[in-house]
Amino acid sequence: MSPQDKLVIALPKGRILDEAMPLVRAAGILPEPAFDDPKSRLLRFGTNHPHIDIIRVRSFDVATFVAFGAAHLGVAGNDVLMEFDYPEIYAPLDLGIGACRLSVAEPDDLAASDDPRRWSHVRIATKYPEVTKRHFAARGVQAECVKLNGAMELAPSLGLCTRIVDLVSSGATLKANGLKEVEVLAEVTSRLIVNRAALKTRPDEMAGWIEAFRKACGG
């Protein structure tokens, strides 16, 4: 079978991968040994199914690989799905992993007297400009977003932006940087995502794997 004919599953690097792999294995997909080798520089891996490969990419890129058909299935947080809003993606299953929230945070001294309900214009550092703008536009608040890909917590102390929008889990990073969570935009978990075209061209195969992941989640 040529590489172009294989079913490709896109998985995110990092913490979510650790939570996703028990579900992937429970669904019956076992990657080759190099997948678990921290020294391996491979990004594409074979599995116990000769017609299935796994690729390991940045979390924000999983949705793009699936939307454009380079991968057929993937695991992505609904934060990423909301930001890109790809019509080519179908998300049939909440995997219940990677739980966190997308929140607004600001310096502790400002949060002590601030009221988010009174905001009319905000300048925000975030990796999620589209989600942020939509959220505040729905409240009639103008949001000026400065796009950053990391180290969001530095923005207020360096005068770049007064507030940030970022993923929050325990809140420990915010606290360590003198910031306080003041508003939640969305609760976030990771979803199984599917390319809609693949659903039409490989319906039985795709439906079978969706069901396998559903059972792996206890459904």
Curated annotation (Swiss-Prot):
Intracellular or extracellular location(s): Cytoplasm
Enzyme class, first EC level, given as a word: transferase
The entry's keywords: Amino-acid biosynthesis, ATP-binding, Cytoplasm, Glycosyltransferase, Histidine biosynthesis, Nucleotide-binding, Transferase
GO terms under biological process: L-histidine biosynthetic process
Catalytic function, reaction form: 1-(5-phospho-beta-D-ribosyl)-ATP + diphosphate = 5-phospho-alpha-D-ribose 1-diphosphate + ATP
Entry EC no(s): 2.4.2.17
GO cellular component: cytoplasm
One Pfam entry name: HisG
Stored NCBIfam families: hisG (TIGR00070)
Protein name in the entry: ATP phosphoribosyltransferase
Gene: hisG
